[in-house]
Amino acid sequence: KNGQPKPNFEPGLLLKAKVVVFAEGTRGSLFRQLSRKFDVWAGKNPEVFEEGVKEIIQCPPGTIEAGQVIHTLGFPLKESMGGTFIYTLPGDKVIVGLVAYLDSHDPLLDPHRELQKLKTHPFLQKMLKGGKVLAYGGKTLPAGGWYSMPKLYGQGWIVCGDSASMVDVQKLKGIHLAMRSGMCGAEMIFKGLVSQSSFDEATTKGYHDLVQASQIKSDLYRVRNFHQSLAKGFVASLPLLAAQEATGGRGFVDEMNSERDALTTEKAVEVWGPDPFSREENQLPKVDNQLFFDKLGSVYLTGTMHDEDSPNHLIVQDVDVCRTVCHPEFKSPCVVFCPASVYEMLPASKKPGQFDLQVNYTNCIHCKTCDIKCPFDNIEWTVPEGGGGPRYTET
């Protein structure tokens, strides 16, 4: 926990390869190191993300018809854009999820709270009557699309899937694109091995060319301005989306720019007034631990586990920023947007009227929102010791 090796410590292996495939999912830690060195986003839109949370709900026997797919937009979100999804499964189970845009200006955006509010809608109240939440999960997903894709190749490396922003955010689908990118990478690597290539850029560019000729481009190029349009708000986005639908994704402006999620957050008083936590929109529905949960109750359903004696993998660069600037002005967004109650601002014992940050890192479910959305870029998510994290089953 204090950075000292334990008796069973084993040093990591140094693996060497002719070519490395970065396929770490959203906000990959190794690829971030590489991207800093090679500036793979030069000339691109910055990465932008959405935070998704979902639950698996067991309903009474005979009440659910499997195979329904429902996507909605808007409710219950107010100051942020996003949507919801409802999928019905065999065995009278329902997946209910909510995805919120992290380039929101709202410092009190709380996807977990909004998911609980979603279940108060009369349609879902009827569908989920008598149901009980079995599992919960949360994760960020890259949303910038085609114009936020980094350089895909270099000397001895390529990047695939979510790490390369390969998600169709209109359909909330990315697994098929991740698989296709892996297949493109495998094809390039196989040809390189057969030809005994050194995997210089001339060789790894073959992966880029295969991606350009694949379903990846056709899917992502069609929705290349989708997220950027919706980020402007529901009403403002409607003519933009209509124009894009009529022009194969181009719309009125191509390409539409985006701003890093951390830079879009506004001060709490500017969004919610002098007493933001008293506003009705920021209240959690009554908890019953059956259908409605607080965050700690939901975290239990993830099965997340970390060794209590392991080092904190959530690195806060400057806790004074949290105390003196972020909490007074922004009301500590990390406390709110984290779907797992990792961050708390507790009264400072020796400084009346001030608050200190406490990091409950063993609660972490590895969504990486804190690394993305902190308005001061003050938190870095690092890989935890020994494979700790959520024990997802159906989620």
Q: Which residues make up each language-model segment?
A:
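Extended, hydrophobic alpha-helical segments in both membrane/secreted and soluble proteins
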Residues: 153, 159-168, 175-189, 203, ...
